[in-house]
């Protein structure tokens, strides 16, 4: 088995809404990334969030909450994950490679934060990041972006930039918009990534977005966490719980200047049954449409050659026999028990 560490930190709070913490915790970048895993609208996050949004890292962070404003800024270092990442980090450290540093900040405006029935959220986030040592063994100045395309049961990462070498640093920037009224809520984010390279290589530019909405059918109330700047579990309209219908569209583009990691559109429809505060059932259907560059780093077929043979490289695809790429549906069911 492997070992990973999530929330483990010390915190000191001042009386004016300012507090600091140090340890291992999520970097504050984006609304979906700051949503607790038990409160996700769908079984998996949107592709752009899975690919770009940073999560748990060791660091130091300051937060200020005041009336309608939430501000967070932190400096972060290495990630504590499984055995593979641990081995990569150790081999790179022995070779004298730096573990990398990230400076991440987020600001959120919550103009009706005192109202429990309705609310509005407008946020921005930015992160300056140098390459980490967990991409591969003896692979300095290297980053990699990939995602499992809305299903973590599928181990193939069709969308994959492969290792990008000679990287100086990355810039992440994001915009967030959300709101709720009684049983209805909506949320959307746009994230862009500029990977700045050395040795005269062009900057690789990637981006993506998602929009999603949901409605509680039996009188429940959507809830929002002001301290997280994200939605939390709704309250229920019936003694037996509540049922929520949800829909999402997301797009990601990992095709840059020289790096072609693929692009994808995804549609997800979900039904959430909140049985108790601790028990939730989720049924999701997703339809994914990948382009011909989403070939899982050369492992997935993406079309046909002119002679009728299967093509694994995008440049081999004869578009007279089809545009190339993969389109498929995913049906998933989750039973979630929270403690």
Regions found by a protein language model. Name each.
Residues 1-87, 94-132, 210-237, 244-246, ...:
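Outer membrane beta-barrel
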Residues 136-339:
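Outer-membrane beta-barrel pore domains
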């Amino acid at each position: 088995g492997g070992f990973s560490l999530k929330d483990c930190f010390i915190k000191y709070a001042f009386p004016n809404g300012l507090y600091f913490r140090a340890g291992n915790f999520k970097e504050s970048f984006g609304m979906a990334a700051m949503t607790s895993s038990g409160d996700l609208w769908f079984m998996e996050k949107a592709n752009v969030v899975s690919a770009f949004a940073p999560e748990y890292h060791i660091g130091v962070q300051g937060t200020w909450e005041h009336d309608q404003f939430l501000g967070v800024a932190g400096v972060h270092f290495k990630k504590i994950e499984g055995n593979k990442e641990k081995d990569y980090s150790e081999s790179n450290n022995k070779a004298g490679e730096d573990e990398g540093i990230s400076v991440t900040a987020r600001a959120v405006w919550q103009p009706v934060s005192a109202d429990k029935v309705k609310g509005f959220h407008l946020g921005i986030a930015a992160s300056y990041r140098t390459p980490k040592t967990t991409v591969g063994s003896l692979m300095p100045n290297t980053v990699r972006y990939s995602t499992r395309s809305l299903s973590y049961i599928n181990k193939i990462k069709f969308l994959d930039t492969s290792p990008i070498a000679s990287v100086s640093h990355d810039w992440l920037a994001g915009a967030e918009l959300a709101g709720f009224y009684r049983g209805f809520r909506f949320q959307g984010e746009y994230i862009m990534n500029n990977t700045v390279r050395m040795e005269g290589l062009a900057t690789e530019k990637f981006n993506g977005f998602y929009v999603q909405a949901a409605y509680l059918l039996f009188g429940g109330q959507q809830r929002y966490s002001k301290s997280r700047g994200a939605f939390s579990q709704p309250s229920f309209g019936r003694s037996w719980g509540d049922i929520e219908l949800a829909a999402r569209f997301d797009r990601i583009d990992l095709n840059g200047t020289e790096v072609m990691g693929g692009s994808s559109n995804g549609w997800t429809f979900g039904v959430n049954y909140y049985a108790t505060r601790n028990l939730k059932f989720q049924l999701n259907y997703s339809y994914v449409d990948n382009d011909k560059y989403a070939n899982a780093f050369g492992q997935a077929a993406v079309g046909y050659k002119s002679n009728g043979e299967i093509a694994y490289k995008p440049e081999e695809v004869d578009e007279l026999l089809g545009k190339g790429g993969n389109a498929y549906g995913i049906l998933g069911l989750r039973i979630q028990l929270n403690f």
